[in-house]
């Protein structure tokens, strides 16, 4: 019987994964500051170390770590507590309690600064976070590397695409960030199969950072590493559409970005 701990189990992604894992017959231990009607649920603030919630990690086959501030607009103060301190506690609990693997919900915000470029987005590309949230996810990935190297914890980090809470998670022009947002759409089916495959991945997968998006037309996210590492193959795809207003906004943002880069280059070249 597969035993999985889900942190942040009451959230958008946590709810979808919980239902999927239940359908597989897995034993679930659910952690969230919000009460969940489930026999394996524990109400806990994971930013505060406590033996009661730490015990839930004991010899789990996998810890799916989703908990934290999910907002790209989160302040430094909120992500420090909920995305830095909390994530450190989760890694530490996984190691101390003998969990086999930790699957970390990272984000495409780690590379958001590459939005207006053209090259493929692989896990090896230089990180380019543009907000505290993106920085916190990058730190979570690096913690995973450290805990894997030092303590032998198997860690898989997913740079998760755009998986909506509303609109039945259907793609379309209603999604934010123009074509960039639509091209990183992640269907519920692909979300669930990606995490299922991560939990089931061979023991020799020691550390990996993988993109997790659906097969969307014109997307830049490279999925080859996910295919090779865990056997991920997207089930769904979309064809992005863009309104005139969104197209104009994207063009203006791209132009502003180029002006900023030009100004930065000029300032750096001067001898002040």
Question: Model segments located where?
Answer:
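N-terminal Rossmann NAD(P)H-binding glycine-rich loop of SDR-like oxidoreductase domains
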Residues: 4-24
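Conserved Rossmann-fold NAD(P)-dependent oxidoreductase catalytic core, especially the SDR/UDP-sugar
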Residues: 89-130
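Rossmann-fold cofactor-recognition segment
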Residues: 33-49
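Alpha-helical substrate-binding/gating segment
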Residues: 162-172, 185-207, 215
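NAD(P)H-binding glycine-rich loop region in Rossmannoid oxidoreductase-like domains
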Residues: 46-82
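Catalytic helix-loop patch of NAD(P)-dependent Rossmann-fold dehydrogenases
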Residues: 81, 118-155
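Conserved C-terminal active-site "lid" loop/helix of NAD(P)H-dependent oxidoreductases
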Residues: 171-173, 209-210, 215-233, 247-272
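NAD(P)-cofactor binding segment of oxidoreductase domains
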Residues: 63, 74-102
């Amino acid at each position: 019987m597969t035993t999985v701990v889900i942190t942040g189990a009451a959230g958008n992604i946590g709810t979808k994964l919980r239902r999927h894992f239940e359908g597989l017959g897995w034993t679930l231990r659910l952690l969230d500051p919000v009460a969940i009607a489930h026999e394996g649920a524990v109400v806990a603030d994971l930013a505060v170390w406590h033996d009661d919630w730490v015990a839930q990690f004991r010899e789990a086959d996998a810890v799916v770590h989703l908990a934290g501030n999910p907002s790209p607009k989160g302040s430094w103060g909120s992500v420090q507590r909920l995305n830095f301190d909390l994530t450190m506690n989760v890694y530490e609990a996984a190691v101390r309690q003998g969990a086999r693997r930790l699957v970390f919900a990272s984000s495409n915000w780690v590379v958001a600064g590459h939005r207006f470029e053209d090259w493929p987005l692989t896990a090896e590309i230089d990180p380019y976070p543009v907000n505290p949230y993106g920085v916190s996810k990058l730190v979570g990935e690096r913690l995973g590397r450290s805990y894997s190297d030092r303590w032998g914890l198997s860690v898989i980090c997913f740079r998760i695409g755009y998986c909506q809470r509303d609109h039945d998670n259907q793609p379309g022009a209603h999604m934010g960030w123009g074509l960039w947002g639509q091209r990183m759409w992640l269907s519920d089916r692909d979300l669930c199969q990606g995490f299922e495959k991560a939990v089931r991945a061979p023991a020799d997968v020691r550390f990996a950072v993988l993109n997790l998006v659906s097969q969307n037309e014109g997307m830049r996210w490279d999925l080859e590493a996910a295919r090779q590492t865990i056997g991920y193959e997207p089930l769904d795809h979309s064809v992005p559409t863009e309104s005139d207003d969104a197209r104009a906004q994207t063009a203006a943002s791209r132009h502003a970005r180029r002006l900023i880069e030009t100004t930065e280059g000029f300032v750096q070249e001067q001898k002040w």
